[in-house]
């Protein structure tokens, strides 16, 4: 008599097949493989794909090759304006600290003589996170919330933060040159920079900017008509907003990929920063004697 055939799936040699294990977790058996590379993957490593499952490494490699969406100004498209929220939080923290330690305003507010003669350069930026009262805080905070939400989405996180910092520094720079003996606090320089930038970028997008223009004119009127307001910080910030906003919105001319656009924006923002540094360091020697301040 002949021998019956072996059961289906059994080895003729009597050996049991070696079970496959996940390539990332050697202690986990699996019967599923990545449909892209063929490596075995356990349930924790399975990423659902249009056909079957992919492993984490193939998914990561695919994400690196996908072009990220960008705005018309070259910034990455964002979901949340995290920089705006962070700045609002820092401004709020600064105000709370002022209530606990009132001497903070004198120690960290903008004072041109203290900056240039005393070497307290940190005042150029720390002054932007301090305020003269609750209404001052609420106005600047509300303006930052509205303008920041729009600008950060248009420009992206990096460009928006650059605009804010250069606006604050420009307001402090003009205060140092024209009113070095005056102590000033507030984010108004940076806020006026946002006004200038939102006008330029909004026009570039073809939006109706008449309401922004009206608000800007009203605030400029308040700047010069209401006493004890640092017009130097407002004007310095506004100039920065128009200049930096124009860099981001109008340059480079013509069509450009995001790498070339980013390079141009970085170089132009760096050039503006260098100009600002020259004014801060060398400006007082020329301006203060002309104004009779020394």
State where each predicted segment sits.
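Hydrophobic alpha-helical transmembrane segments of polytopic
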Residues: 83-91, 164, 211, 215, ...
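C-terminal transmembrane module of polytopic alpha-helical membrane proteins
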Residues: 1-76, 224-294
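N-terminal TM1-TM2 helical hairpin plus the immediately adjacent luminal interfacial "cap"
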Residues: 73, 79-187, 227-229
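Membrane-helix interface "capping/anchor" motifs
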Residues: 152-159, 200-210
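Aromatic-anchored segments of alpha-helical transmembrane domains
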Residues: 96, 169-173, 217-226, 274-279
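Membrane-embedded alpha-helical segments of multi-pass transporters/permeases
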Residues: 173-177, 206, 242, 246
């Amino acid at each position: 008599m002949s021998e019956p055939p072996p059961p289906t799936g059994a080895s003729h040699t009597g050996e049991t097949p070696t079970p496959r294990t996940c390539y990332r977790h050697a202690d986990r058996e699996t019967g599923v493989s990545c449909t892209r590379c063929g490596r075995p993957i356990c349930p924790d490593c399975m990423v659902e794909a249009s056909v079957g499952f992919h492993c984490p490494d193939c998914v990561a490699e695919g994400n690196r090759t996908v072009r990220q969406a960008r705005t018309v100004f070259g910034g990455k498209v964002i979901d949340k304006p995290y920089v705006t929220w962070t700045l609002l939080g820092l401004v709020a923290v600064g105000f709370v600290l002022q209530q606990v330690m009132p001497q903070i305003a004198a120690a960290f507010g903008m004072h041109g003589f203290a900056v240039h003669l005393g070497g307290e350069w940190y005042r150029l930026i720390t002054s932007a996170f301090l305020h003269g009262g609750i209404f001052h805080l609420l106005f600047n905070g509300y303006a930052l919330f509205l303008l920041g939400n729009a600008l950060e989405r248009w420009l992206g996180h990096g460009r928006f933060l650059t605009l804010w910092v250069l606006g604050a520094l420009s307001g402090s720079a003009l205060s140092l040159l024209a009113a070095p003996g005056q102590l000033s606090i507030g984010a108004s320089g940076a806020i006026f920079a946002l006004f200038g930038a939102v006008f330029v970028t909004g026009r570039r997008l073809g939006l109706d900017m008449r309401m922004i223009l009206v608000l800007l004119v009203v605030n400029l009127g308040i700047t010069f008509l209401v006493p004890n307001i640092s017009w130097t910080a407002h004007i310095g910030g506004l100039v920065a907003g128009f200049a930096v906003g124009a860099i981001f919105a109008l340059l480079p001319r013509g069509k450009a990929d995001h790498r070339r656009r980013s390079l141009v924006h970085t170089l132009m923002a760096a050039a503006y920063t260098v100009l600002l540094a020259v004014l801060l360091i060398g400006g007082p020697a020329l301006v203060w004697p002309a104004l009779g301040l020394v």
